């Protein structure tokens, strides 16, 4: 028995020495080569809301992307990662071939368009000319309604046309201008295309065809002549007749009239195809169009291709003091006088109107900050910047500024709530404070308005291990559990268990060694393997 024990100890020592020379691989924690890049986050989720909840809990700047699966009927899984991390793998073009940006609900975004028509049903249509005329019309409308000047050089024009279908994406790169969210962008698009919608409605007196995408839009098909005239007068432009937008009316494969512009892409958490991605089952990817006139700014640290990629992202909008956020309501001519939201119910007219932000608890906290010193302030409007998880509140009736130690006489202030860093601070619209780039001292947020507290009731934890999510960085070699009886194991059973564990350890070492050799020649992990691992988890 002693001899057998000594032999076993010697065997253990030999194996320990072996593992010291060739240790088992630790859990892979990918990180980009540049030291300044943040730690890698790369997680997959079956459900979109879980992906967004995970993003909100992260201190890092991460985003949600949708990956189209080859299995199932249009099934998608959701990837959470940073722009830099995604581009690192995306640029190889060997994986992640069918990717979509998920445009977050309520988030400030760029103006964008999805254009398409059936070539066989429209043999005389000149797609390039139609795109050029549309850009010209949109630029003119932006100047008329908002006094925003732009041209074709500010429009990223992407093409994924085939022999059967003309298809384009337009993403406007407005200088220091963005829309409050994609719903407001959609309202603006519908408003400026009213003459074209009217032409379609004349062909079908009963209602606008479903292909036009007018369900629940809040717009009548009658052109908004009065509002357009008012907008022109506001910016000092002469009145004019409705523009001829007949070039936007095309026919679908059934021969029915429809709009060249897809009005269905301005919905909640819309999936919008990424630059250089293709639809599943299709071989044509979204590339820079031949007639594209937009050129991104040159940068020493970012390649031109990466710049194009970042420019194509609709929700890639960062907060700045000079950023102007545009709004467009479904029917501003029928808009009621809005109440300035405050705890006392004091009613004042709000130019933009106010509804609660995605975080009503934060709204109430901000109201508590501006209701003091016998002054009853309120929230004039808010804007949500998803990349930074930043809420920017324009305050009304409360003008106290930390920079000057008193209230401004006429200029209003802003309260900014940084949910990722759990702080709030004050800035203001006063020209002198803006010139100084003034920002007040950061103050911590109360626990009850921290993101972790706000998300506590969600079906989510930061370390998910259930069937609804998985991570590419998660260790897949989970050791089996051992069922021990209350009285322990017998000597024979101990020998069997020990041998089994030794065998398992040996197999693990051999597996790790084989994996190193097999993966050494691979540039990346195929899409099929990623999706199969997720579905089998």
From Swiss-Prot:
Keywords, comma-separated and alphabetical: Chromosome, Coiled coil, DNA damage, DNA repair, DNA-directed DNA polymerase, DNA-directed RNA polymerase, Manganese, Metal-binding, Mitochondrion, Nucleotidyltransferase, Nucleus, Transcription, Transferase, Zinc
Renumbered residue ranges of the record's region Interaction with RPA1: 462-536
Cystines in this chain: none
Chain intervals with Low complexity compositional bias: 468-478
Coiled-coil stretches: 1-22
Binding residues annotated for Zn(2+), in chain numbering: 401, 408, 428, 433
UniProt cofactor(s): Mn(2+)
Cellular localisation: Nucleus; Mitochondrion matrix; Chromosome
Subunit structure: Interacts with RPA1; leading to recruitment to chromatin and stimulate DNA primase activity. Interacts with SSBP1. Interacts with POLDIP2; leading to enhance DNA polymerase activity.
Family: Belongs to the eukaryotic-type primase small subunit family.
Protein name per UniProt: DNA-directed primase/polymerase protein
Gene that encodes it: Primpol
């Amino acid at each position: 028995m002693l001899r057998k024990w000594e032999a076993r100890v010697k065997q253990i020592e030999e194996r320990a020495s072996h593992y010291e020379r060739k240790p088992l691989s630790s859990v892979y924690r990918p990180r980009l080569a540049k030291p300044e890049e943040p730690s890698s986050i790369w997680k997959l989720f079956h459900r979109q809301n879980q992906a967004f909840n995970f993003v909100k809990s992260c201190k890092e700047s991460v985003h949600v992307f949708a990956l189209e699966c080859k299995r199932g009927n249009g099934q998608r899984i959701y990837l959470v990662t940073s722009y830099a991390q995604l581009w690192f793998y995306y640029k190889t073009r060997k994986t992640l071939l069918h990717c979509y940006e998920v445009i977050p609900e309520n988030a400030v975004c760029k103006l964008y368009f999805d254009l398409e028509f059936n070539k066989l049903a429209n043999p005389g249509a000149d797609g390039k000319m139609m795109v050029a005329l549309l850009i010209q019309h949109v630029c003119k409308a932006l100047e008329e309604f908002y006094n925003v000047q732009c041209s074709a050089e500010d429009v990223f024009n992407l093409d994924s046309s085939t022999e059967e279908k003309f298809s384009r994406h337009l993403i406007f790169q407005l200088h220091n201008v963005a829309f409050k969210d994609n719903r407001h962008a959609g309202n603006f698009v519908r408003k400026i295309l009213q003459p074209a919608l009217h032409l379609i409605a004349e062909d079908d007196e009963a209602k606008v065809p479903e292909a036009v995408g007018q369900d629940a839009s809040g717009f009548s098909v009658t052109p908004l002549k009065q509002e357009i005239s008012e907008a022109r007068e506001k910016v000092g432009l002469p009145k004019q007749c409705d523009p001829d937008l007949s070039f936007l009316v095309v026919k679908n494969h059934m021969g029915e009239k429809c709009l060249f512009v897809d009005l269905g892409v301005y919905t909640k958490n819309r999936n919008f195809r990424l630059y250089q991605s293709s639809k599943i089952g299709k071989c044509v990817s979204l590339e820079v169009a031949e007639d594209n006139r937009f050129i991104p700014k040159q940068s020493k640290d970012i390649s031109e291709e990466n710049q194009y990629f970042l420019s194509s992202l609709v929700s890639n909008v960062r907060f700045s003091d000079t950023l102007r956020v545009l709004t467009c309501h479904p029917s501003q001519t029928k808009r009621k006088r809005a109440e300035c939201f405050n705890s006392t119910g004091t009613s004042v007219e709000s130019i933009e109107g106010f509804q609660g932000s995605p975080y009503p608890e934060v709204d109430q906290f901000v109201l508590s900050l501006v209701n003091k010193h016998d002054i009853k302030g309120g929230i004039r409007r808010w804007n949500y910047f998803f990349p930074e998880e930043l809420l920017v509140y324009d305050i009304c009736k409360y003008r106290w500024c930390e920079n000057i130690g008193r209230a401004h006489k006429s200029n209003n202030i802003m309260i900014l709530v940084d949910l990722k860093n759990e702080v709030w601070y004050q800035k203001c619209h006063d020209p002198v404070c803006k010139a100084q780039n003034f920002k007040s001292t950061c103050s911590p947020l109360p626990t009850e308005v921290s993101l972790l507290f706000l998300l506590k009731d969600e079906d989510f934890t930061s370390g998910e291990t259930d069937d609804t999510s998985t991570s590419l960085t998660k260790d897949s070699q989970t050791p089996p559990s051992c069922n021990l009886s209350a009285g322990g194991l017998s000597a024979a059973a101990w020998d069997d268990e020990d041998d089994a564990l030794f065998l398992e350890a040996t197999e693990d070492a051999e597996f790790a060694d084989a994996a190193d050799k097999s993966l050494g020649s691979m540039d990346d992990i195929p899409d099929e393997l990623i999706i199969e691992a997720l579905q089998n988890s």
